[in-house]
């Protein structure tokens, strides 16, 4: 049972969107869910990690790069998406600095299914370390659909500190879209926690430049 009511979610979304409307920025603000955990010991308790696909793309401007074979390079080119071939990856020569730079340049990667097993051999552990190991795409998959799927997926990952933040939307979304993303994200997070709601200290929603709104 969610401890945050749909009405509370709606009023938080309304407040955030109204605030951004009053102070228009020259970029699209991201809306983030910030979570404070309690009764959790990251040293002893299992550090959870989970991904979920939201009904509406939270970050449409997310930059994506395709690591592809000839077929997928061609598809990427037609779709106007950045792409790299095996030869391009070999040129990085497993150089840690260059791989790190690549991981920084893009928000996410998609790789041809046939190449996915070669990625660690070609690049070393750099992309995994950055939490950006590529999602696989097969030739029968719709590449554009895959890109939307990757852009819609958010990841909750507990590291050493008891707070985390995830993008759940942006200020140009309709209220219903943002509310749907937010409630799904909260319920999924609670399902990852050992003691569910008992592990949640606070839930705050905030746009990039806006005031925080406490939900819980």
UniProtKB/Swiss-Prot annotation:
Main location: cytoplasm
GO BP terms: cytoplasmic translation
Disulfide bonds: none
Keywords: Cytoplasm, Phosphoprotein, Ribonucleoprotein, Ribosomal protein
Entry coiled-coil feature ranges: none
SUPFAM superfamilies the UniProt entry points to: Ribosomal protein L1 (SSF56808)
InterPro entries per the UniProt record, alphabetical: eL8/uL1-like, Ribosomal_uL1, Ribosomal_uL1-like, Ribosomal_uL1/biogenesis, Ribosomal_uL1_3-a/b-sand, Ribosomal_uL1_CS
Residues bearing PTM Phosphoserine: 85, 128
Pfam families: Ribosomal_L1
Subcellular location: Cytoplasm
Any one GO CC term of the record: cytosolic large ribosomal subunit
Gene3D superfamilies linked: 3.30.190.20, 3.40.50.790
Gene Ontology molecular function: RNA binding; structural constituent of ribosome
Function noted in UniProt: Component of the ribosome, a large ribonucleoprotein complex responsible for the synthesis of proteins in the cell. The small ribosomal subunit (SSU) binds messenger RNAs (mRNAs) and translates the encoded message by selecting cognate aminoacyl-transfer RNA (tRNA) molecules. The large subunit (LSU) contains the ribosomal catalytic site termed the peptidyl transferase center (PTC), which catalyzes the formation of peptide bonds, thereby polymerizing the amino acids delivered by tRNAs into a polypeptide chain.
Subunit note: Component of the large ribosomal subunit (LSU). Mature yeast ribosomes consist of a small (40S) and a large (60S) subunit. The 40S small subunit contains 1 molecule of ribosomal RNA (18S rRNA) and at least 33 different proteins. The large 60S subunit contains 3 rRNA molecules (25S, 5.8S and 5S rRNA) and at least 46 different proteins. uL1 forms part of the L1 stalk.
Miscellaneous comment text of the record: There are 2 genes for uL1 in S.pombe.
Family to which this protein belongs: Belongs to the universal ribosomal protein uL1 family.
Entry protein name: Large ribosomal subunit protein uL1A
Organism of derivation: Schizosaccharomyces pombe (strain 972 / ATCC 24843) (Fission yeast)
Upper classification of the organism: Eukaryota, Fungi, Dikarya, Ascomycota, Taphrinomycotina
The gene coding this protein: rpl102
């Amino acid at each position: 049972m969610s401890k945050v009511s749909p009405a509370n979610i709606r009023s938080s979304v309304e407040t955030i969107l109204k605030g951004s409307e009053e102070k228009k920025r020259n970029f699209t603000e991201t809306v983030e869910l910030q979570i404070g955990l309690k009764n959790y010991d990251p040293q002893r308790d299992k550090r959870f990690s989970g991904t979920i696909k939201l009904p509406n793309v939270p970050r449409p401007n997310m930059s994506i790069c395709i690591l592809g074979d000839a077929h997928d390079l061609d598809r990427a080119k037609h779709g106007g998406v950045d792409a790299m071939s095996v030869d391009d990856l070999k040129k990085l020569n497993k150089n840690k600095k260059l791989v790190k730079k690549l991981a920084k340049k893009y928000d996410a990667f998609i790789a041809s299914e046939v190449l996915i097993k070669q990625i660690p051999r070609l690049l070393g552990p750099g992309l995994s370390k950055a939490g950006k190991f590529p999602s696989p795409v097969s030739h029968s998959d719709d590449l554009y659909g895959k890109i939307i799927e990757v852009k819609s997926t958010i990841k909750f990952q507990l590291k050493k500190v008891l707070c985390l933040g995830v993008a759940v939307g942006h200020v140009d979304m309709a209220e219903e879209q943002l509310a749907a993303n937010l409630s799904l994200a909260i319920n999924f997070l609670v399902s990852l926690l050992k003691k569910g709601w008992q592990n949640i200290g606070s839930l705050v929603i905030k746009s990039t430049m806006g005031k925080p709104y406490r939900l819980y």
